[in-house]
Amino acid sequence: MQFPALPAIPHPLQFKSVTFTALKPGPKLIVLGAVHGNEVSGSKAILKMIAEFEEGARLLQKGQVTFVPITNPLAYNRKQRNGDRNLNRNLTPTDNPVDFEDHVANWLCPLLAAHEVLLDIHSFQKGDVPFALFGPKNNKSKLESFTHEEAERGLALRLGVTRFVDGWLDTYAKGVANRVELLKKTGGSGEGLNTDPRYGMGTTECMRSSGGYAVTLECGQHEDPQGPGVAYRAIENTLIHLGLVEGAAVEAVTDYQHLSLVEVNDKQHFEDQFVRPWSSFDLVRKGELIGIRHNGDEVRASRDGFIVFPNTLSQAGQEWFYIAESNTQP
């Protein structure tokens, strides 16, 4: 499968989206790529899909689809994860933008709110098998109330992957509580963006807070040549599943792995080190040595589970790795 070349962006301080609207009403879908600037598999797939619509190979039957190939152009131009900070944290509009990602939020959040369904395409630093993340079960909690559980999980099961993860925001909030406690013990104020549970707000959380539903696709390791194809099939399946384009019905996968995030561990010092090069979904046993703090303290697994999103490049006070457990519930 051939994909268009990634574009140069001579002026990264502006934003671009491409929207197709059918004559008949229907669902409003938005597809994001390069929320993190070095994750471009989704961008390649989105550009291919845009070209197919523009060339007449595809026709929107109903509703609307908006494509954003490069959501964070500054980070993309720098070929790095962030521009000034992580766009997928504290994603909320502000009257007083301080960094570039604040400006992105002021553009992106209203755009998300104008749609009903989000597919956000990412890739990961360490690991091999693509997977998708979906949100909570229906609930009325203050942190992340939600009413579209069936639709969201139904979409996730049709993206073409067989591994699924949930529990993100709830686990992040628990991690924030631990972060605040540590700061107070060490003389910190316990105040600031990364000590607010809402700091965990990213694109999918923003979409859910606007009344829609959202799925994140992690389409493979950053440099995996199969990544754009995984992303392309997910976009196509989503368009068909929502009835936006014609195509044979996409069946939900029935044989899959479902994991729930249950714990997050921060890097406390820039010299904290893993004891080996962990990859997402490596199995860990209770008591197994995972890393060593700069002061020599050992970091061991608190339970049997799987390590997720191990980040050797994380900064002190930010997430170092997550632990997930198998979930037998659909």
Predicted feature locations:
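Structured catalytic-domain cores with a bias toward divalent-metal coordination
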Residues: 1-330
